[in-house]
């Protein structure tokens, strides 16, 4: 199984330097509460380190992956259903999730089929810390390991 990283943008665009905005657009995270799924890779890790004060990320488990894939959209407001996945990719929905988990399909390469990035809601109950502090210091941004799945559960 390839290790997958869930990345969520938690801060907006105001007073963001151009090189941070450029990197966030390469990661397809143009607005706050947008999310993407990437394989764990050194190039992705370098971009995440550059924009770490604007995003939070961590390793996805099966539940977090399933929740994020369930929030995929065909177009604005239209959710992906099993018939759409069967029609476009010729696999059922469970096989689609398994192929993403195994690394056979890369979700970030399927932008002609799905409307990317994945749009999420603000977390239920609010953020537990300040958005302007790193996660390990009691804040919200930066690397959070497997605790990203708890945040995804609250944002879906």
UniProtKB/Swiss-Prot annotation:
Statement: the UniProt record of this protein carries the keyword Nuclease: no
An example Gene Ontology CC term for this record: cytosolic large ribosomal subunit
Gene Ontology MF terms: RNA binding; structural constituent of ribosome
The keyword Cytoplasm appears for this protein: no
UniProt superkingdom: Archaea
Pfam families membership: Ribosomal_L30
Similarity comment: family membership: Belongs to the universal ribosomal protein uL30 family.
Protein name, as recorded: Large ribosomal subunit protein uL30
């Amino acid at each position: 199984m390839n290790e997958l990283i869930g990345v969520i943008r938690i801060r907006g665009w105001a007073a963001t330097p151009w090189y941070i905005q450029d990197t966030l657009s390469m990661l397809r995270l143009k607005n706050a509460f947008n999310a993407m799924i990437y394989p764990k890779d050194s190039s992705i890790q370098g971009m995440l380190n550059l924009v770490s004060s604007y995003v939070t990320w961590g390793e996805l488990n099966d539940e977090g992956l399933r929740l994020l894939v369930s929030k995929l959209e065909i177009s604005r407001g239209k959710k992906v259903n099993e018939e759409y996945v069967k029609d476009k990719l010729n696999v059922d929905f469970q096989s689609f999730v398994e192929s993403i988990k195994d690394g056979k399909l890369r979700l970030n390469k399927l932008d002609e089929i799905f409307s990317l990035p994945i749009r999420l809601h603000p977390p239920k109950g609010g953020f537990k810390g300040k958005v302007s502090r790193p996660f390990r210091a009691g804040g919200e941004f930066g690397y959070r390991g497997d605790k990203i799945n708890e945040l995804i559960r609250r944002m879906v």
